[in-house]
Amino acid sequence: MNFIFISPAFPKNYYNFCERLKKNNVNVLGIGDTPYNELDIKVKNSLTEYYKVNSLESYDEMYRAVAYLAFKYGKIDCLESNNEYWLRQDAKLRTDFNINGAKIDDVIAFTSKSNMKEFYIKAGVPVARYKFCTSIEEDLEFINKVGYPVIVKPDVGVGAQATYKIKNEDDLKNFYNYDHQVPYIMEEYIEGNITSFDGICDSNSNVAFCDNEVFPPSIMDIVNDNLEVSYYVNKEVPMDIYDAGSRVLKAFNIKSRYFHLEFFRLTKEKKGLGKIGDIVALEVNMRPPGGYTPDMINFAQSLDTYQIYADIICYDKIINVDMNHPKYYCLYFGRRDRLEYKYSYEDIKKIYPFIQMHERMSDALSSAMGNEFFIARFEYKEDMDKFKEMVSKKKNEE
């Protein structure tokens, strides 16, 4: 099997996908913009060959790279970046070279937020009302129906970038003062906590492996206001999340992919959507959850999600991972450089020696993930909450 992996050096934990594929005797061929001599040795060792391009943004360069690798190694069986930013380009390359996997028409369905709505409805999952941002007058008609606040965000975009809460007519006018280069949609505001259904599905859109994360109420506010970020991997997947997530995968006809499906769990009843505790669709992301979340899943479930991915790609089932291991909660806490914290890493390590990771976050991901992060796992949620309290404590706090 020939597998082209796009950008194997970034994010820096993604070499693990290549390494596990190679372990399964896959010919892993990398394309990236990092000079070969600057690649980490782990990335180099996970690849059969690496083709450097000047820019991953240049489709002509990417096309030539794939053509070269196909000429040298024969038919390309898979091409993937597992990165939201490159999903459409991945799909176009698959389409142009007739490579297995989601083609460009398929990917539009799960990268466009407006298209997502129709598939959520098909899956029987409630979804927030929306419209395209067209003019102040037409937007006000929508707001008169759903009330303030409303959320505006690019119809196609990554994470919470360029997402805003419109609280009044002045905010709306201010939004239109800027020349937005891409289509925006406006959604009714949902009061709820964000929770996700993450995992890997097989070639028949069946869940092969899954987990659940619980996030802060607003990633948008974290990005826009440079706030701290904290979220955790749950010990178990709630049944309503599993049921809704499984139906969404079938509705989108997702095959042999890592997925990250986001939902609101309502904290306030919303007419037409649900009662407190019900779930409402947020977004579909057909790639792994961001940052080091795949590693957090590994820590929480005592397994290797990268190997699960490789097994599904190669065998369409899990054969190299023992799924019967103890499960834990796993917390991520991202600190901000602008804040002064009471306890250093050394202080925290003395009390919590089982910290799994402590590093600086790359600048490219820091807006949503913080500048310095801690990842730790716990048998009990109460211990996780105490750890979070210590890590977040500021110098001026009692």
Language model region names:
Residues 179-183, 189-231, 239-279, 285-294, ...:
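Phosphate-binding core of ATP-grasp and ATP-grasp-like enzymes
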Residues 103-114:
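A short, structured active-site edge motif that brings together acidic residues
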Residues 276-280, 286-336:
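C-terminal structural cap/anchor segments
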Residues 112-191, 203-204, 231-243, 390-394:
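Active-site nucleotide/adenylate-binding loops and adjacent lid/helix of ATP-dependent enzymes
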Residues 310-398:
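Peripheral (often C-terminal) accessory segments that flank ATP-dependent C-N-forming ligase machineries
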Residues 1-105, 381-382, 386-396:
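ATP-binding N-terminal substructure of ATP-dependent carboxylate-amine bond-forming enzymes
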